[in-house]
């Protein structure tokens, strides 16, 4: 069973998926946001295709740790997802993930126009890896 991460941007949604053992995150796709119905239908198909058992959403709290309009939007997205799929949804603090994603893409020598599109996918990878790492810290050997 895999974990799916979603980085909800202004125009694009970045997606990342874990391996079946929930150790490694990898970028999956970038979707342009058209409308809610399109998003929900594509999400249901993706969940089935990858055997997803849990969803992680980047949670955009302010630098001081306060909620804002973006956090309300993500909470709404989570509630919308819950109406169509019966999976646990977790929030992960996404502060600085966009900056880190841009740095990774710059270091990878990705062209500027491609970076703009790939930024959300890379941010989703970072969010998911943070979550997976937190799971491994909870596991006792």
Curated annotation (Swiss-Prot):
One of its GO terms (molecular function) is nuclease activity. It comes from the Bacteria. InterPro entries: RNaseH-like_sf (IPR012337), YqgF (IPR005227), YqgF/RNaseH-like_dom (IPR006641), YqgF/RNaseH-like_dom_sf (IPR037027). The lineage of its organism: Bacteria, Pseudomonadati, Dictyoglomota, Dictyoglomia, Dictyoglomales. Belongs to the YqgF nuclease family. It is found in: Cytoplasm. GO terms for cellular component: cytoplasm. SMART domains: YqgFc. This is Putative pre-16S rRNA nuclease. Keywords: Cytoplasm, Hydrolase, Nuclease, Ribosome biogenesis. It is an enzyme of class 3 (hydrolase). Its EC number is 3.1.-.-. One of its GO terms (biological process) is rRNA 5'-end processing. Could be a nuclease involved in processing of the 5'-end of pre-16S rRNA. It comes from Dictyoglomus turgidum (strain DSM 6724 / Z-1310). SUPFAM superfamilies: Ribonuclease H-like. Gene3D superfamilies: YqgF/RNase H-like domain. Its main location: cytoplasm.
């Amino acid at each position: 069973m895999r974990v799916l991460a979603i980085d909800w941007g202004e125009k694009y949604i970045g997606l990342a998926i874990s391996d079946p053992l929930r150790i490694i995150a990898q970028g999956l796709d970038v979707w342009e946001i058209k409308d809610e119905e399109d998003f929900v239908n594509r999400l249901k198909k993706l969940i089935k295709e990858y055997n997803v058992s849990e969803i992680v959403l980047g949670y955009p709290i302010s630098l001081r740790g306060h909620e804002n309009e973006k956090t309300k939007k993500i909470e709404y997205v989570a509630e919308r997802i819950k109406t169509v799929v019966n999976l646990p949804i977790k929030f992960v603090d996404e502060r600085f993930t966009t900056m880190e994603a841009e740095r990774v893409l710059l270091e990878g020598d990705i062209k500027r126009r491609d970076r703009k599109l790939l930024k959300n996918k890379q941010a989703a990878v970072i969010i998911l890896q943070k979550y997976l790492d937190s799971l491994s810290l909870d596991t006792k050997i």
